[in-house]
Regions:
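Double-stranded beta-helix
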Residues: 2-10, 23, 88-119
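A short glycine-rich, His/Asp/Glu-containing loop-to-beta-strand
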Residues: 6-41, 47, 105
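Short, surface-exposed charged micro-motifs
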Residues: 21, 50, 59, 66, ...
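A cytosolic small-molecule/anion-sensing beta-strand core signal
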Residues: 26, 54-55, 70-71, 89
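Short, charged/polar surface micro-motifs in flexible loops or helix N-caps
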Residues: 27-29, 36-38, 55-59, 66, ...
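Short, conserved beta-strand element in jelly-roll/cupin
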Residues: 34-35, 44-62
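Short beta-strand His + acidic residue motifs that chelate non-heme Fe in jelly-roll/DSBH
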Residues: 60-61, 77, 82-88, 93-95
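Short acidic-glycine-tyrosine-enriched beta hairpin
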Residues: 63-79
Length: 119
């Protein structure tokens, strides 16, 4: 068992939209990501996702409206719900989701990360 400092982990990388794995439990992964600008519209067929804002704020765009998330807020996006994170400024986000979750869900493009770094 070891303690993890999220701030120190976030300081290890600069890329946006490139999640890093910082922990695993029961088939789930704890991931960190830096968001900036709009991501892509996508959904996940089999996985729910949790987004927790560590620093900054972002909008989770949904087809039926937007949800603003600020530091300290979290949101669970159920499987099958199309969504697009969009951050006006760099935002630090912790995600909790099954290890099988592909960051771009049902879409594969230049933002798709099939192999995630463990930090």
């Amino acid at each position: 068992m070891k303690k993890v400092n999220l701030i120190q982990k976030f300081q290890l990388f600069n890329e946006h939209w490139s999640p890093k794995v910082v922990g695993e439990l029961n088939g789930q992964q704890v991931k960190l990501g830096k968001f900036k600008g709009p991501f892509i519209w996508h959904h996940h067929e089999n996985e729910d996702e949790m987004f927790y804002v560590v620093k900054g704020s972002f909008t989770m765009e949904l087809r039926d409206g937007n949800i603003e998330l600020n530091e300290g807020d979290f949101l669970i996006v159920p499987k099958g719900v199309e969504h697009r994170p969009n951050a006006a400024e760099e935002t630090w986000v912790m995600m909790f989701e099954p290890a099988t979750t592909l960051n771009t869900g049902n879409v594969e493009n230049e933002l798709t990360k099939k192999e995630l770094d463990i930090i």
